[in-house]
Amino acid sequence: MDLLKKLEEKKDDNNFLQKFEETKLNGKRKLSSFIHSKTGILVDPSSLFDVQVKRIHQYKRQHLNALQIIAQYLRLKNGTNKYEVPRTIIFGGKAAPGYFMAKLMIRFINGIADVVNSDPDMDGLLRVVFLPDYNVKLGEIVYPATDLSEQISTAGKEASGTGDMKFAMNGALTIGTLDGANVELRDLVKKENFFLFGKTESEIMDLKNNNYSPKTFIDPVSYTHLTLPTK
């Protein structure tokens, strides 16, 4: 990170910035080609690549990201929301052999992808991809191609991994909770370059101690009432 700070000297260098954008786009083209070869899904390299790749687990909250996709899909179908740029949402990760809920989450994400990607109304707006057999080698293709890194694990649950740092060092912005290495990353890149998400560990404990009802967070405006059962 100390070495990368030297790049701040180039922030007004248009020639450098153009080369940086070209390098990012080439990385996205490489990942787009890989996605098509492995899944048959065509994605636009110029779309925003919104990525969550990590072990599938409830506290890592891939299912929360998936529910957000449903809400965005419904907004787009109803014409109440338009992305400024097309968006490709990419998942990757493996589930432990005996972890039924994690395997169900993978099935859920693939089901959403089937619906979204087969809907002609979503052409040029939204694509959803689950990368099969995600591993370190595949990460070498994913990290350089990512625009937005999803680091939304439940605060207080995540060990201090390095995935968020790898994304950041390859030019991705981060949306994340104050958990694990996100805390250090936010200090390094500064608050204005980190999209803070969710509650802190102490706020979560307060909710649990006060026997909160999840129904109080279901908001008709955000379409969560259509993505979650209320009865």
Give residue ranges: language-model regions.
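Active-site proximal loops enriched in glycine and acidic residues that flank catalytic Cys/His/Asp
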Residues: 53, 60, 91-94, 130-132, ...
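Extended, charge-enriched "interface" segments that sit outside catalytic cores
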Residues: 1-42, 46
